[in-house]
Amino acid sequence: KEDADRFISYAAEENLEATVIADVNDSGRLVMTWRGDKIVDISRAFLNTNGASQRKDVYIAKPDEEGFFVRPEIKDIRAMWLEAMGDLNNASQQGLVERFDSTVGAGTVLMPFGGRYQKTPADGMAAKFPVRRGQTDSASFMAHGFGPDLAEWSPFHGAVYAVLLSVTRLVAMGADWRRAYLTLQEYFEKLTDRTSWGKPAAALLGAFHMQAALGLGAIGGKDSMSG
């Protein structure tokens, strides 16, 4: 309670709204009121159960040693080049991007494509902060990272490099990566056994490993993974 004002001031520095919503006492009950009427009155012991306990055994399979980081033998460089250029992951997304009006935002700093011929995709998004009066030179940056082939070979390595790639793109755009926050998105197959559960477990470990190495935290995201 004595730290509430300091906590609120820290939140304000991050442009976040914070307010005191409850007082903690030793009654052992959670009581909520609305317009003077008591609408919730439940035991703290019930809350401590945190619902049904859920535990899973996982098996994290070792990735194939003859995998992603092993350089293939080059027999026909022309054929390999054409195969790489025909990969959907290397295809131009300009047609899709142009279906959205990238000029509608007054705070837009980077266009989706740049360079002499307006064909080079930007490493991420940059936009000025909205201000009520005057002008600002302050902007926010956002970038993403994901390697589908790497993640298929090893969810652990996929998560590690997803975090690293997104932060690297921020650096390439000129942002201070030390002030970055992460948000993680997940999508996995139906989880039915120890091996399938091992895939999201490995990805979580990989993401957390890189978060700890960089000293960056995840502050929420889509679905369930950022927690």
What feature does the model see in each segment?
Residues K1-G227:
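Glycine/proline-enriched, intrinsically flexible loops and inter-domain linkers
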